[in-house]
Amino acid sequence: PVMRLHGSRLRTKNQKDRHPDVKERSGGDNEIWSFGEENYKILKGLVELRERLRPYICHYMDLASETGAPIMRPMFFDYYEDEVCYTLEDQYMFGEDILFAPISAQGQTGREVYLPEGSWIDVNTKEVYEGKKWVTCTAQLHQFIAFVREGSNVINVF
């Protein structure tokens, strides 16, 4: 999920005179309350989740700074011995403990997800799955498909 709360707002004066080389391509409302009450509740929940994930994110950003290991990783980054992970183009690891499998088509409510070796907890149902297999997952508009590696404390933020 994109969690953007910043950016250009509607202009109050022409910036061209002050900054002739700057092109402002946006200017629309982008605050979470700008998209209606139903969407506000969804976006507010995502912002709150991001805040709960802050220590996890900071840890992996520090690690990225020290080692160059990205926080958002292709599946084969951590599971290089699993050949299936080299074929996955639409799911990724977020650090070592969170697996995201986005729904990317409008109207889609489910998808197949490959879980690599280990035990994985569905963040929506808290059901535990054994890895090295495909599972079918569903999610509503206000949810996303994600799994946490069993044993990780990050499950507590979901």
PLM regions with names:
Residues P1-V157:
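Catalytic-domain carbohydrate-binding cleft regions of carbohydrate-active enzymes
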